[in-house]
Amino acid sequence: MKGRFHFYEGYNMKDVTFPIRVMHELGIETLFVSNASGGMNPSFKIGDLMIITDHINMFPEHPLRGRNFPTGPRFPDMHEAYDHKLVDLADSIAKEKNIEVQHGVYMGVQGPTFETPAEYRMYHKLGADAVGMSTVPEVIVARHSDIKVFGISVITDLGGFDVPVKVSHEEVQEAANAAQPRMTEIMREMIKRS
């Protein structure tokens, strides 16, 4: 699937996660997600690939709110939202191909504004390494449907440090486009080996 529905575009969570429901009905067993995110970890630089090991959900609406879908339990366990075997496989492939990767916790927020310096600092103190405006709702619904998940973020901008850095959508897209071949190489090889 290319692209996604974003909550900040005015879609509700049922709309945002509908493609995942369709994928479940089609029988997929593994979901690969990617996104562009702002890095808050001091060891990150623009263009880094961050393998998502966990997430923090800061969206104002939960994708499982309301009547429970029969695809999963009312209260799904999220202790391993991102499959550790897939993370290990990605690490192995990245090492083989000399592709540097980072690991971290992704925070999903509503958007559409980029974060203020104070928000970056707060999110980092809460345990996030990167922040973006997608991914978390889709991952929650995938896990509710017993679909394994692998996630990767392209660090497209940096925030939360002593010097505030302005960011534009164009710069984010430019950084994402530059990192895309490395990300694609890892994911393509993962699919071959899965």
Residue map of PLM features:
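Zn-dependent metallopeptidase/amidohydrolase metal-coordination segment
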Residues: 133-171
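Metabolite-binding pocket within alpha/beta catalytic cores that recognizes anionic/polar moieties
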Residues: 1-78
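Active-site/ligand-binding-proximal alpha/beta "capping" segment
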Residues: 92-129, 194
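Alpha-helix C-terminal capping segments
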Residues: 22-30, 43, 124-126, 140-148
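Generic non-transmembrane alpha-helical segments
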Residues: 85, 89-99, 182-193
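General beta-strand structural signal in soluble alpha/beta enzymes
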Residues: 2, 31-35, 51, 101-107, ...
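His/Asp/Glu-rich mid-to-C-terminal helical/loop segments that flank catalytic regions of hydrolases
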Residues: 159-194
